[in-house]
Amino acid sequence: MILYEDPIENETTIAYISTKTPIIPSICDVLVTRGTPSFDETGLKHNSVVKLNKIATIKTHFIAGLLGTADEVLQAEVNKALDACLKFAPQE
């Protein structure tokens, strides 16, 4: 999942997506499952988990293609989980 694109450095920050969904997700996991409104837009074919404790920055040219998009609901879930997982300080 693309978290951030830096056009100046030509780099993209991504989070790992796996089809091995945990029985009990951690605070760093965001489940993307069939039957939820967000699932269809993602282009994923199976229930999946976005692992926000597995983040990498890669050169954009290594990205072969995109499957779909994250709707506003999924983006909000990812942002909330990122805050919890990385323990960002609350904004004042």
Describe the predicted segments one by one.
Residues 2-92:
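Conserved functional hotspots at enzyme active or ligand-binding sites that engage polyanionic ligands
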